Swiss-Prot record:
This is Serpentine receptor class delta-48. The keyword Manganese does not apply. The gene is srd-48. The lineage of its organism: Eukaryota, Metazoa, Ecdysozoa, Nematoda, Chromadorea. It is a multi-pass membrane protein. Its main location: membrane. The chain crosses the membrane at residues 8-28, 42-62, 89-109, 127-147, 185-205, 236-256, 269-289. Belongs to the nematode receptor-like protein srd family. One of its GO terms (cellular component) is membrane. It comes from the Eukaryota. InterPro entries: 7TM_GPCR_serpentine_rcpt_Srd (IPR019421), Nematode_rcpt-like_delta (IPR050920). The keyword Transmembrane helix applies.
Length: 316
């Protein structure tokens, strides 16, 4: 029952999300001002990663069966007709692209703090900071390569997947969630850390940014300060969306995976909640960045045109 309902949901969700993501990319490319030159790149990468994440999750339609030992990863989407290793590659792509969206938002918040605090910071230091914050993504890639070697390297293992999936009609087994390996432990730490630690860290940095903005001299106008606050508030909201959407189901996942409880609702709904923030992110970006918001207000006819008033001055 869950599979039939969610197969329709995934298609509908993708149709809803894709146009907003493409529209967001268009607005960023077309209407970014000079002062958004750096942030434009991160906003674009974020939306592109979200498109990849949603597309792969909709093609996979995953279910992690927690009551089996080891925990099996089932695929109900169109990708199930491919080989197990191909499907697992899509699974890895969905995982990495999702993590990228979380870390890109946090990196943007941190670089905004650096920009507010030290205007003349050297470019090489920014590069070092970005690479350090992206290190968990590289670790995830290495860990997944290690797991793929374990799952698919022996020919007997691939034959086992082929034989197992040959007798299944509605889904395919594409891999396992195993414990006892360093790579599995690192993946768990990175995934849970990105969901539970990045949002509070982003909120803490936001407070420091607002403090820096408020303490700046009068050289920055009220409008400029408002634009900065609006931008950072939008980024903070983006970083908190995964926590709000995923926190309860992740807690449930942790319990059922340890107790080996069969809970179909949790198994099916987890991937849905993972991609749910992508529905709201484009709207947050377009509203929180002032040039984009002004352009959309212009398109909607909400910007009032002030008539020119000619005043005659009299010299005394």
């Amino acid at each position: 029952m869950y599979g039939e309902i969610l197969s329709f949901f995934y298609i509908t969700f993708f149709i809803l999300v894709l146009p907003t993501q493409i529209f967001g990319i268009f607005v960023i490319l077309r209407f970014s001002t000079k002062h958004l030159k750096l942030w434009k790149k991160f906003l674009l990468c974020n939306l592109i990663c979200q498109i990849i994440s949603v597309a792969t999750l909709c093609l996979l339609q995953l279910r992690q069966v927690s009551n089996l030992s080891p925990m099996e990863i089932w695929c109900y989407g169109p990708i199930r007709h491919f080989s197990a290793i191909t499907s697992y590659l899509f699974y890895v792509l969905s995982q990495i692209s999702t993590l990228m969206t979380y870390f890109l938002v946090f990196i943007t918040i941190y670089l905004k703090y650096e920009a507010v605090k030290n205007v003349n910071k050297q470019n090489y230091r920014k590069v070092v900071i970005i690479l350090m914050l992206l290190l968990p993504i590289f670790i995830t890639m290495v860990a997944q390569i290690d797991l793929m070697i374990v799952f698919f390297s022996p020919n007997e293992a691939q034959k086992k997947f082929n034989e197992l999936n040959a007798i299944i009609t509605d889904h395919s087994v594409i891999g396992y969630v195993i414990s006892g390996r360093i790579s599995s432990f690192l993946l768990t730490v990175i995934i849970f850390g990105s969901v539970f630690l990045l949002p509070p860290a982003g909120f803490f940095i936001r407070k420091k940014i607002i403090r820096c903005i408020n303490s700046t001299s009068d050289s920055a106008s009220v409008g400029q300060k408002f634009q900065r606050r609006s931008f950072i508030n939008g980024l903070t909201l983006q970083s908190f969306l995964p926590l709000v959407c995923i926190c309860p189901i992740f807690a449930c996942y942790f319990v059922v995976s340890r107790t080996k409880t069969d809970l179909p609702f949790e198994q099916h709904i987890l991937p849905v909640l993972v991609m749910l923030p992508t529905l709201f992110d484009p709207y947050i970006i377009l509203y929180s960045v002032t040039p984009y918001r002004k352009q959309i207000r212009t398109w909607l006819g909400m910007t009032k045109t002030v008539p020119m008033v000619i005043v005659a001055s009299v010299m005394i």
